[in-house]
């Protein structure tokens, strides 16, 4: 956690940042921060560290706090503390990673419930980059059998590596 550990409640505006996975775009994060009303910003991922904390809190500023949760398995995805941290967020960002980890660990869990709450009840800005973007839709490539190139998928959309799911994860 970077910033104030005390929870704040701000007026938020819903919206989505769908980022490709290369360089982070300051303007996109600033847009999320503005729509969060300067509240608590949460980043979720399955691997990695808290590199977004100094970027959002110090470099961009304007948030009460930022916390990164590394949710690396089913047990972590059903942790009540992770759930509470997520539902208390005024902005949520899903970091780069492996979308199979996200689908496998987070689907049918408290993390999924918390993200759906933020989107559909609390109406906060939500963003994702790379794998975090890939799962923010009704249909998504889950990468269950590894990566597939565009040329492979287009030449054989029914190939063994093409694993696509529909309407069974996040309710966005």
PLM feature segments, named:
Residues 1-101:
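Extended, subdomain-level signal for the structured scaffold at the beginning of enzyme domains
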Residues 104-172:
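Class I SAM-dependent methyltransferase SAM-binding "motif I" and its flanking Rossmann-like core
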């Amino acid at each position: 956690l970077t910033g104030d550990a005390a929870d704040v409640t701000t007026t938020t505006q819903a919206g989505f940042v769908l980022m490709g996975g290369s360089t982070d775009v300051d303007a996109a994060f600033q847009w999320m921060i503005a729509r969060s009303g300067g509240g608590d910003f949460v980043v979720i991922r399955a691997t990695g560290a808290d590199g977004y904390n100094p970027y959002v809190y110090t470099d961009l500023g304007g948030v009460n706090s930022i916390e990164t949760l590394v949710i690396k398995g089913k047990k972590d995805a059903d942790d009540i503390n992770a759930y509470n941290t997520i539902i208390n967020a005024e902005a949520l960002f899903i970091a780069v990673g492996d979308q199979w980890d996200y689908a496998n660990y987070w689907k049918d869990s408290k993390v999924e419930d918390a993200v759906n709450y933020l989107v559909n009840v609390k109406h906060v800005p939500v963003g994702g980059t790379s794998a975090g973007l890939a799962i923010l839709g009704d249909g998504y490539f889950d990468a269950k059998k590894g990566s597939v190139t565009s040329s492979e998928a287009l030449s054989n959309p029914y190939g063994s590596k093409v694993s696509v799911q529909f309407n069974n994860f996040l309710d966005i």
